[in-house]
């Protein structure tokens, strides 16, 4: 089963006052904490891919070396400013083009989500052949 992990890094941070995804936390941007864990997870599973969906050029630029290394892919989603449904849609459309059997959505503003929790969720999705799962 081909699972695409959709990493939703496109929020508007209206209440936060600035882009919370880029806010420094424990030595790196908030969005990088869970992303780095998900990249490790995807690297251990042959049929799992990591796809970052964002409306931010800076995130695309920062992730370019990881894209080049084949660790993840990115999708630019300018419509994400309209809401999370546009971000999810952009991710699912990209996953469909890659012939994914399932999509698992993770929000980038969850820096403390444990690697083992995320991996168990994904393994459970795969075992149940669930076409869509979300961790928000």
Please give the residue ranges for each predicted region.
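Nucleotide and nucleotide-moiety/phosphate-recognizing core
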Residues: 2-108, 112-136
């Amino acid at each position: 089963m081909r699972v695409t992990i959709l990493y939703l890094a496109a929020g508007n941070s209206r209440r936060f006052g600035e882009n919370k995804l880029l806010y420094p936390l424990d030595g790196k941007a908030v969005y990088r904490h869970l992303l780095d864990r998900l990249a490790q997870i995807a690297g251990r599973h042959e049929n799992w891919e990591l796809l970052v969906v964002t409306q931010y050029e800076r995130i695309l630029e920062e992730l370019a070396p990881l894209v080049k290394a084949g660790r993840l892919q990115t999708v630019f989603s300018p419509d994400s400013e309209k809401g999370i449904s546009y971000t999810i849609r952009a991710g699912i459309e990209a996953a469909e083009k890659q012939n994914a059997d399932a999509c698992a959505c993770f929000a980038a503003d969850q820096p403390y989500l444990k690697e083992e929790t995320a991996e168990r969720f994904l393994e459970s999705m795969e075992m149940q052949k669930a076409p869509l799962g979300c961790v928000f």
